[in-house]
Every structure is written in C-alpha cells, then in structure tokens.
Regions:
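Conserved alpha/beta-hydrolase "acid-adjacent" motif
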Residues: 218-224
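Flexible "cap/lid" loop of the alpha/beta hydrolase fold
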Residues: 101-146
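Conserved alpha/beta-hydrolase catalytic His-Asp/Glu region
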Residues: 134-204
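Short beta-strand element of the alpha/beta-hydrolase
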Residues: 22-31
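Catalytic active-site module of serine/aspartate enzymes centered on a nucleophile-bearing elbow/loop
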Residues: 235-265
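Active-site loop/oxyanion-hole signature of alpha/beta-hydrolase fold enzymes
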Residues: 3-15, 40-48, 52-98, 257
Length: 265
C-alpha cells in the first residue's frame, strides 16, 4: 500500500489484505536500517483477523521515498502523521529496537491517538558502540555484518527459519543492505545514540503496554527492557528464552502468540 505523508510517498505492507478504514489499525515500526519485511510473520495474522496491519517503511527506507529522518522525535511525529494520513483517529503501535524508541516517544506525545503499545527488544536508551556507528556512517558493509551477528542469539546463528531455505542472518543482511548504509543505518544509529528522552517519555504513557524481551539479547538486554517497563504504569512483561534481539524473526510464532493475546483481549 502506498500513500503520502508530508509530501513523500510511503510504503506499508498490509499483510496481504486490502486496507479497510472500518477496521482497527495496527502500525508496526521497524528497527535501525531495516524495512517492513521484518514484520512479515506477524502482520499477516492480524490482517486476516479483523485488523488493518500497516508495517511501514520509515522515510528513506525500503520502498518509502524521501530522506531518512535524523531524530527519534521526528520519527515519532511521522508515525502520528501516518495515522492521520490513512484516515484513522487512533492506532495500536508495535515497535522493535529503534522502533521502540520511536513508539514510546510517539505515545508520550500523542496519548489520545495510541490505543495500545507493544515493545520488542526495547530499552529507554540505545547508546551505540562507537566503532559500529563509525562503520555505518562511513558506508562500510561490515556495520551490517556486525549488527546481524550481535542481533541474533545462538540458535539464530544456526538456522531455524520458518521458511525452508532461508537463513535468519542472511535475510536480515539483505534487508539492511537494500539501501545505502550511510543514509539508512548510519542515520538511524546516530538518531538512537542522540536520543535521551526515553525514560521521561515512558513515565507519561498511560495506555496498555506490553514489553517482549529475550534472554539472549545483546543489543537491548533484559535488564534494560525491564527498567523501561518499570516506568510505564501497568506494563506487562514477557520474556522469551533462548532468543536474541531479532525475536520477531527468530521466534516469530512465540512472539505472535504473546502479541495477539495482548492486542485482541
């Protein structure tokens, strides 16, 4: 599905079903340097069970036009604009990694527009490794290779992809290298490194919130996810064992089970 936000064309996957303004809206926000494709194993379920699923490509990513937004705050405002652009007054938000920073900030800024908030592999702050940041900003493909190595748990390194013939790390690498690294991953990493408002934003959130964390997450460890969740009144926490930061791909079925129980009840 394509539509315009602030004069630029936006692409969003609808999970294989036509968009219907009468159905409740769920917006999925991807992590640094990635695209809507990371959500392919979650969006389809909701699209076929009474929801509008929109897995968006952030500006400058995937199939969306424009330049990458340079701050988490800009991205948060953009998500709010997406809700308006598709003719809805509210949405449930689902974010992964950087997408958690974006959706936390968005929910704190626009509380009347957010019905529920689901965070995967989230933290209140995501300071970047200086070497990784430098590699990404200098368009070095090693940045993607390192990110994918750290982002997957031990099991994710050995296979287990639900689609026969695919490999978790190669799939993620392909997505991250689909656009110029310095203009996507480099910009996103810098935005994460600069963002300092996550904990204060979390304190303002009043809508039902779910945090899905993973025991083998090296990028946003469980303790950081719990710290963020503790600041959100009534936040639910679910921890997935033997899984890394890319839980939405490594353990797609387990993540979907938790997510659909939270959103649909």
């Amino acid at each position: 599905m394509k539509f315009k936000v602030n004069g630029h064309e936006v692409f969003a996957s609808t999970g294989g079903r036509p968009f219907d303004k009468k159905k409740p809206l769920i917006i999925f926000v991807h992590g640094s340097g990635l695209t809507h494709m990371t959500w392919v194993l979650q969006t389809r379920y909701f699209a076929f069970h009474g929801y509008n699923s929109l897995a968006v490509d952030l500006p400058g990513h995937g199939l969306s036009s424009g330049e990458s937004l340079k701050s988490i705050e800009e991205m948060a405002d953009w998500v709010s604009d997406v809700i308006d652009a598709v003719g809805h007054k509210e949405a449930s938000l689902v974010g992964h990694s950087q997408g958690c920073l974006v959706t936390v900030e968005c929910t704190s800024r626009y509380p009347n527009k957010i019905k529920t908030l689901s965070l995967m592999g989230g933290a209140g702050a995501i300071p970047m490794n200086p070497e990784l940041l430098s590699l990404a900003e200098n368009n070095d493909p090693k940045a993607v290779d390192l990110m994918m190595d750290w982002a997957h748990g031990p099991a994710g390194h050995f296979g287990g992809h639900p689609v026969p013939g695919l490999y978790h790390i190669n799939t993620g690498t392909m997505l991250a290298k689909s656009r110029t690294i310095e203009n996507t991953l480099g910009v996103d990493f810098r935005a994460c490194d600069n963002y300092k408002n996550g904990f204060e934003a979390a304190k303002k959130i009043k809508c039902p919130t779910l945090s899905i964390l993973a025991t083998d997450d090296k990028m946003c460890p469980v303790k950081e996810g719990k710290k963020l969740a503790s600041l959100i009144d009534g936040s639910q926490v679910d921890i997935i064992d033997n899984c890394g930061h890319m839980m939405l791909l490594e353990e797609a079925d387990r993540v979907l089970t938790v997510l659909k129980k939270f959103i649909t009840t």
